[in-house]
């Protein structure tokens, strides 16, 4: 017999201890990994609900199992909210992750061996945009495009590559690019050769929902996103489209189920519905505006302290530090800041001489710290502390002083008050 007062702490102390330590880590560390964020308690409530018990293969009104009348309501709410939030006329909320959403798009629009233009991973792209270690690089003929000397997407190069290689699909989107993408220009290039434009907006979906960053949905044939990152929802994926045919939408649905997945995670879909509603609130727009302001404020400090910021600016929630001229590796920077309770991730930079396991750069993002209530003044202080550590990575006293400052500001800005 199952009882509602069953809990992990009384049953599995070893596991519970690790979970509790993670709670402490999140509260006592400053999170600057650009792809991470904090979900609301409402989102977590949905993920811990009894919806996890329900199998619901298929789509609302067309299930392979009985007893789906209420999960149909849940999924339809998520679909309708996704369409309304991003101005789409099609949404699939079932992908378990952004990568699986991307896989569904590839299998819908392409055949193995087709040519695809994707952003070079070292220039800011993503594994699923053509990395040789990923399915995208293994199954398709990938032609990478990149950024120019100023750190911005080279649209002339992209147009020339498209003309030369005649890809069937061009991918827009990124995991480490701090500029604004000209979606209309990308669509123009795609149309000039009869290619599909597929946009992966995972990193900027929250900014787009709030009107802080341009929306690719009116320009792309298909758009995907994660529902975490800047959108601040549960970990999962989403597929969107506007102005496409019913045939395309049916193919996309079939590519998700039964093509790549079985039963959807209904508790996660409920959490997506909650997060999408939260993203429609005025407070969410204010939050996203502050995310962008905080990123700009941090860039100003790093530049003033003599650090090289790729492109010299940011127009979204993230930026890259190029540490080559500081004689530092990304791995060293990551470790030193980690000792001061500041969490970042090492990241390759354009023309990086180091391996992806070492790198010469560091990616910094502001969604999580802004979620805690950090202001521009707070992140300017934070950026200054980071510079102190990066300039003295072997000085334990500097790192300890910085850690104490971090603990103090974390105490003043709890993740969950």
UniProtKB/Swiss-Prot annotation:
Protein's cellular compartments: Cytoplasm
Keywords: Amino-acid biosynthesis, Cytoplasm, One-carbon metabolism, Pyridoxal phosphate, Transferase
Binding site for (6S)-5,6,7,8-tetrahydrofolate: 121, 125-127, 355-357
Keyword Cytoplasm: yes
Main location: cytoplasm
UniProt KW Transferase keyword: yes
Gene Ontology BP terms: glycine biosynthetic process from serine; tetrahydrofolate interconversion
GO molecular function terms noted in the UniProt entry: glycine hydroxymethyltransferase activity; pyridoxal phosphate binding
Positions bearing N6-(pyridoxal phosphate)lysine: 229
GO cellular component, one term: cytosol
Pathway: One-carbon metabolism; tetrahydrofolate interconversion; Amino-acid biosynthesis; glycine biosynthesis; glycine from L-serine: step 1/1
Superkingdom, natural source: Bacteria
Cofactor(s) named in the record: pyridoxal 5'-phosphate
Pfam families: SHMT (PF00464)
EC number: 2.1.2.1
Residue numbers marked as site, Plays an important role in substrate specificity: 228
Annotated function: Catalyzes the reversible interconversion of serine and glycine with tetrahydrofolate (THF) serving as the one-carbon carrier. This reaction serves as the major source of one-carbon groups required for the biosynthesis of purines, thymidylate, methionine, and other important biomolecules. Also exhibits THF-independent aldolase activity toward beta-hydroxyamino acids, producing glycine and aldehydes, via a retro-aldol mechanism.
Annotated family: Belongs to the SHMT family.
The protein's assembly and partners: Homodimer.
Protein name (database record): Serine hydroxymethyltransferase
Organism: Sodalis glossinidius (strain morsitans)
